[in-house]
Swiss-Prot record:
Entry's Gene Ontology molecular function annotations: ATP binding; polynucleotide 5'-hydroxyl-kinase activity
Protein's name in the database: Polynucleotide 5'-hydroxyl-kinase grc3
Broad enzyme group: transferase
Encoding gene per record: grc3
EC number from the UniProt entry: 2.7.1.-
Main location per the UniProt record: nucleus
Gene Ontology CC annotations of this record: nucleolus
Record field: compositional bias (Basic and acidic residues): 76-90
Length: 839
């Protein structure tokens, strides 16, 4: 482990310009690296794609953009041949140039479609929006670790989705909102969109859960950003199951008016199966879901795949579930290997509301989910590790349940703010947070003794991440370890196997997920999840969450004093390297911060004393501290098991100074700057702090000494923390900049203009030539309304760090073409050495 003084943590970016400049300097080093094209390998898909007779015709009728790209490629190839360069060298050079351009190119996003479709149909816009800091939610370059890269697919294969075909015998009843069908045993049905599922007869499987007949209705989200869930009949009455699917209106589709990342992810125009079941409905009828037989049924021609389980995955889930309440499993593996998918399937399987299982065990204590992946968490926004207690299965990707606040299907027991998407910047704090969450799980067992535990470990599995993983395997008292890759590498599998052997627990190795391409990168999914987090609400009157399309700039903020007699914010901490107090205002304004409840005035880890985790705290007289404590004592030694006397942990003692005495007031704004440490800021002690959620600092009112915070944290949750005597500290970490919040007003203005154009076109169609006086009066007001909407767009586009391109230049066309590209996952991106710099 590194010492505190030796950690080279990057400070939080002072501005978007500084972040962009730093990234440009890093991008200049890319050409010197060797392309890793030889390291790419993919695992075979679970099922081979079946080519249909219509595919050839579809390819011939495709748009001409692919043909143009082919001619450009052939022209470049001829020029390279004339220059005397061999094909192999030219291929490597081209691959290197593409990677360099994608790393240094500013992100762009298209935004308009000329077709005036219905309110629920997906749409594009023609403008390209650029974020000047190169870290926007619409960034097209790969993630920082380089395990995703944009690729162009010549044509989409026609992939089979549903085995069931709807007809008069299988459709029981249908209307504009509802569809009730029969599914025969071993047959399945795939839907695209979001809907409520009710199992009336038989037993069906969905995303690992076995759903039996009951009065319970399950909300299902099936966007095109992920593999589509499959509804399969596994047992039926007279060989058939009966399900009812109903449209739901949660408002999540409205987020497409605020971000292009939410466009083209739900169902498009009605498919042939939809039209069959909507014969008696009006021509304009459209549900929030569509039945798909094959991927070619999609009107938007997207890359759609069903979510099928590998046989090894099914066997492992069945074996793990037989441990019932004694299950304590850690799921780890490389990035993009399917850890989250497997965890979600196992979670849903354990939470299946079956009357009883083969072992006569019925889960009434729920399932504990310990999420140690701060980059792609399942039930919280990025930058957090947490322990959740769940009582019902969840059907949808993480951005459909970014928070459990106010929900009836689960709750967050405790969470800690890591302040980054990777724990490698401060592994000591990460391990202490994991140990505290594990202690909370042991306390949870007192009330729910048969509650199993699922631990989701991040893809940080090499180098120091492997050291942390092996230490957790030895320390957490697990029952199983699952590694999500059959291709090694040996330098990872062997230490994990040795740690599992020493802990006397089995290690199961499973193949990684069969998905090779995704339509959203991990950075884009993080932006979608945190944007969903800030727009989601959980009314107490209903069981399902709702999403509001009100932009962040128009949302009602929390106004809190940071100075004076009514001070509500005790301190502001900036994780990473120390900054000048004069820069705190610039670092904080417009940033995402963690709202942390400090449960003790001695919540800063100073490293002044130490103790083994399994022993009680030593009093001051027996402390090993002699006033000159080494920095090594503040770190967590992970070379030995938990019973080793060399295992130490930093903690606070009554002799630790109060963090109130460590606050420095800034000269101009009087902000309470909290910093403790030498070179880098010591984080809050996980045993004495709890993260309530995230907030966006919308403005800092210096004259009145107030902060405007936009946060979805329920007011009751903050009030309870204050009533218990906890102080509120804002922690500014190194999370992605909220560029999505900067562009929301622009996209909302464009959506309003498009909605007005659609209403005008519909009015003209309904009234003919506008014969009546009301129509004439409305037509006279149309120029005024259109001018107001255009002025709104103009004002919304004048935002710092954002540029709108509205021309039809080559740069615009190339950006629009890149938006149609997919992201290829690098599954065999294993290092040749143990150095993390290879990644």
């Amino acid at each position: 482990m590194k010492r505190k003084a030796e950690k080279q943590q990057a400070a939080a970016p002072v501005s978007a310009f500084a972040a962009r400049k730093a990234r440009q300097q890093q991008a200049q080093v890319v050409p010197s690296e060797k392309p890793a094209t030889n390291e790419l390998s993919t695992e075979p898909p679970s099922k081979k794609p079946r080519r249909s007779l219509e595919e050839g015709a579809a390819n011939l009728t495709a748009n001409g953009e692919d043909h143009v790209q082919t001619r450009r490629s052939s022209r470049r190839k001829q020029e390279s041949l004339r220059s005397g360069v061999s094909d192999e060298k030219q291929h490597k050079k081209a691959a290197l140039n593409v990677r360099t351009r994608s790393a240094a190119q500013p992100p762009a996003q298209k935004d308009e479609e000329k077709d005036l479709s219905g309110a629920l149909e997906e749409e594009d816009d023609e403008e390209v929006l650029e974020e000047e800091n190169d870290a926007g939610a619409i960034a097209l370059d790969g993630d920082a670790d380089g395990y995703e890269s944009p690729v162009d697919v010549a044509h989409l294969q026609n992939f089979p989705l549903s085995k069931t075909r709807l007809n008069k015998n299988s459709v029981i009843y249908s209307d504009e909102q509802t569809l009730c069908v029969r599914i025969k045993e071993k047959m399945n049905l795939v839907l695209l969109g979001h809907y409520d599922l009710w199992v009336k007869r038989g037993v069906v499987s969905l995303m690992g859960a076995k759903l039996h007949p009951s009065a319970r209705v399950y909300r299902v989200y099936a966007p095109s950003t992920h593999s589509l869930p499959v509804i399969k009949c596994i047992a039926g009455v007279d060989g058939e199951a009966e399900i009812e699917v109903k449209s739901c209106h949660s408002g999540i589709y409205r987020l497409r008016h605020l971000s292009p990342l939410y466009q083209r992810i739900w169902n498009g125009k009605n498919t042939s199966a939809d039209r069959l079941t909507l014969k008696k409905a009006p021509a304009s009828a459209k549900r929030t879901f569509s039945v798909l037989y094959t991927s070619s049924d999609d009107s938007l021609n997207r890359h759609l795949r069903p979510l099928h389980l590998e046989k090894q995955w099914s066997s492992a889930i069945k074996s793990l579930s037989q441990r019932n309440g004694q299950l304590r499993v850690l799921i780890c593996g490389p990035k993009a290997s399917g850890k989250s998918t497997f965890s979600r399937y196992l979670l849903n399987h354990l939470l299946s509301p079956a009357p009883q299982t083969e072992t006569d065990f019925r889960n009434t204590d729920g399932v504990a989910f310990l999420d140690l992946d701060p980059g792609q968490p399942e039930f919280s926004p990025m930058g957090q590790v947490y322990l959740a207690h769940l009582g019902s299965p969840f059907f949808g990707p993480p951005f459909t349940h970014p928070s459990l606040d106010g929900g009836q299907d689960g709750s967050i027991i405790r969470a800690h703010h890591i302040g980054a998407t990777s724990p490698k910047d401060d592994p000591d704090h990460y391990v202490l947070a994991a140990m505290d969450l594990m202690d909370r799980y042991r306390s949870l067992l007192a009330s729910y003794p048969q509650c199993p535990l699922i631990i989701n470990y991040p893809g940080w599995i090499f180098g120091l991440g492997l050291e942390v993983a092996t230490w957790l395997v030895k320390s957490l008292g697990l029952s199983d370890v699952v590694y999500m890759s059959e291709k090694g590498p040996a330098e990872v599998v062997e230490p994990l196997s040795q740690a599992a052997y020493e802990a006397r627990i089995p290690l199961t190795t499973l193949p990684s997920q069969p998905t090779d391409f995704v339509s959203r990168s991990s950075a884009q999914l993080r932006s979608m999840q945190i944007q969903s987090y800030f727009h989601m609400s959980q009314p107490s009157e209903i069981q399902t969450p709702q999403w509001l399309e009100t932009t962040i700039s128009k949302s009602r903020p929390f106004v809190v004093d940071y100075a004076g007699p009514r001070q509500g914010i005790r301190g502001i901490m900036v994780m990473g390297s120390q900054i000048s107090p004069d820069l705190l205002h610039d670092v904080l304004d417009g940033a995402i911060v963690g709202v942390v409840a400090v449960e003790s005035p001695n919540a800063i880890m100073t490293g002044e004393s130490e103790q083994p985790p399994s022993e009680p705290a030593m009093d001051e007289g027996n402390s090993q501290s002699d006033g000159d404590m080494s920095d090594v004592a503040s770190d967590v030694a992970m070379e030995d098991g938990p019973a080793s006397p060399s295992t130490k942990t930093a903690h606070t003692t009554p002799a630790s100074p109060s963090f109130e005495t460590m606050i420095t007031r800034t000269s101009g704004e009087d902000l309470p700057y909290l910093f403790v440490g030498a070179g880098s800021c010591n984080p809050l002690d996980p045993k004495a702090s709890n993260c309530l959620g995230l907030a966006l600092v919308r403005s800092i009112d210096v004259p009145s000494r107030k902060l405007e915070l936009v946060t979805p944290i329920p007011g009751l949750k903050i009030r309870e923390a204050l009533e218990q005597g906890h102080g509120i500290v804002l922690v500014r970490g190194m999370l992605d900049n909220p560029n999505w919040a900067l562009s929301e007003d622009y996209y909302a203005a464009r959506a309003a203009e498009k909605g007005h154009q659609q209403s005008v076109a519909k009015a003209k169609k309904d009234t003919g030539a506008g014969e009546d006086g009301d129509a004439a009066a409305t037509s006279d007001q149309q120029p005024t309304v259109s001018a107001m909407l255009r002025d709104r767009i103009r004002r919304a586009s004048n935002v710092p760090w954002m540029t709108v391109i509205e021309d039809n230049s080559r740069r615009h066309r190339e950006a629009a073409q890149r938006e149609k590209s997919l992201w290829k996952l690098r599954k065999k991106a294993y290092p040749g050495s143990e150095s993390e710099t290879d990644w």
